[in-house]
Design a protein with these regions (language model features):
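Conserved active-site and SAM-binding loop architecture
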Residues: 1-191
Length: 191
């Protein structure tokens, strides 16, 4: 999940040859840096990638750094409440979670010297490896809380750069808290 190209663009701005990859088209304005499709054929490097502008790029050897944002729909602790319906395991959702775990683990085991995998707090049922650290938006100048986990390989932990007081939880429009009527406003967010 890197269709926004925020990470890719940040690395390009400081001189790195970075690419984004997602099954969706990019929204960051740089199709010449975006590989649209499944990341798995390219994850270990030693490949030829074609960016959205139709240009082929040869990757010799492994990537220098892999930053991954795999889908969290079935893995996150927030989604765990959907696993049990009337005290019965939702088998379909559980199996989708196992597929999500296999995808997640492919990033952690990629042939790459430096790896960062980002995801929300995982549900314990899937037994993901222990994350290296957690970060919060308010540690980087954004006045919201949303605990995010990082699994790091050969990378130092991130250090806060601009700690501010959080004004509420980060919760985009259309998320759980916005599906309730006005009496629930403010319980999950400050909006």
């Amino acid at each position: 999940c890197e269709e926004s190209q925020r990470v890719c663009t940040a690395f390009r701005q400081i001189g790195h040859e970075a690419y984004s990859c997602d099954v969706q088209e990019c929204s960051g304005g740089h199709p010449e840096w975006h590989i649209q499709g499944d990341v798995l054929p390219y994850i270990d490097g030693s490949c030829i990638v074609t960016t959205m502008d139709g240009v082929e790029h040869r990757i010799d050897g492994t990537w220098d750094l892999l930053i991954a944002h795999p889908p969290c729909t079935y893995l996150s602790n927030a989604g765990a409440r959907h696993l049990w319906k009337g005290h019965v395991l939702n088998q379909e959702r559980y199996e989708k979670g196992l597929e999500g775990k296999a995808f997640f683990m492919r990033f952690l085991s990629a042939d790459c010297p430096r790896i960062c995998v980002e995801n929300p707090v995982p549900s314990r049922i899937y037994e993901l490896p222990k994350y290296t650290q957690t970060i919060q938006p308010y540690e980087y100048g954004h006045p919201y809380s949303k605990r995010t986990c990082l699994w790091l390989k050969n990378l130092p932990p991130l250090q806060p750069t601009d700690i501010v007081d959080p004004v509420g939880t980060w919760c985009p429009s259309g998320s759980y808290s916005h599906k309730h009527d006005a009496k629930h406003k403010g319980i999950f967010t400050k909006d």
